[in-house]
Amino acid sequence: GTTVGKWESTVTDNFFPYVQTSETGNHVGVRYVALTDETGFGLMAAATETMEFSALHYTAEELDRAVHPYELQAEADTTLRLNAIQLGVGGDDGWTRLVTHEQYRPHAPVYRYGFILGAITSDDDATALARSWQTSVAAK
């Protein structure tokens, strides 16, 4: 096992400007993610088990089209991606098309995961809210 942590960041800080643009900012083993504005109002996703997520000011298509970070224009909108698992970009770096190492490849033929989406406000305790959502799903 490992220690569970609670982390805070900004959408802007989730982007890393690799020399050659690629997907970035993916978080794994996540129980919930809350995206809020400066007033604390926003959207929360709570996984029924765990999930992966990224939150960026760019879509996957925009990242794929750009060769270098300076070609990207950050949008005010946030693109939230929720995944069960990703293969990743592969290899030992982000700029060559090497195959992902065997130990990092997903092997199950089918993956299933669930999550609950809902609003969150500054009055909510995100951890307690996520637990209550997860408990209500588990009871069904």
What positions do the PLM features span?
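Beta-strand/loop-rich accessory regions of lumenal/periplasmic or secreted enzymes
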Residues: G1-K140
